[in-house]
């Protein structure tokens, strides 16, 4: 394990480890201020869908609710910024709780889970029973009829645009993004969380869009007649004024979390499931497309962007 000078640094280190490896990051902290110092790191992991398990200490069960030294309701504090959290009252429940925490952190849309353990439970003795590794819950497949509808929308489009977020990295779907873009002759833009999913060397890749992004990516998104959005939540950094966002485009929104569909931008079609699987199936369903006028316009925008950046 790695000891840090401050718990906030430990939380961000666990977050960074999870981003770099795809594995669950783990952070441990003492009760009271140690636990509350984790909050910013936990919130970061929650908003960016990063798998993390935070394990905190607390006062003994007998002192809970008495405003004891370094007693903090850390489960209550972190409820809005965790996928789930646990307060372990009995030693008999500890092993299964930790296993479940790791399962929740990696299942579906990843995120942080907190396990709060009172001091008397930490000091208790109990016979450990080995158990199989708990795998993440499987993601249900998308209905074929919805995939067929998406394929029909793609084939009807004249100016398609692929817009990807961090889900492309989480689901290791970069190759599927590139394959679909080639199949439907579309440019690729991304959110900040989607950077590195597609290499900058790909001629279709326009970079990050939005207020902090590239001109070509933002303008082409607003000129598109179909936006295929996958693994992102349409945050305000990318959309700007939602009433004026891509007014001429139909939208297909793909996300593993159904609650993200239609939340910020209404979609003409929402698909809930694995981004990698959905894009792979769409590649099989759509016919090869050619959009020479659209791609010529994309090249114009890329050239103008390069000119702006050179100034």
Question: Where do the language-model regions lie?
Answer:
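Anionic-ligand anchoring segments at beta-strand to alpha-helix junctions in alpha/beta enzyme folds, i.e.
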Residues: 1-15, 28, 142, 149-227
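Glycine-rich beta-alpha junction loops
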Residues: 59-60, 117-122, 166-168, 195, ...
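Conformationally flexible catalytic loops at phosphate/diphosphate-handling active centers
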Residues: 72, 100, 104-156, 295, ...
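Phosphate/diphosphate-binding loops
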Residues: 210-261
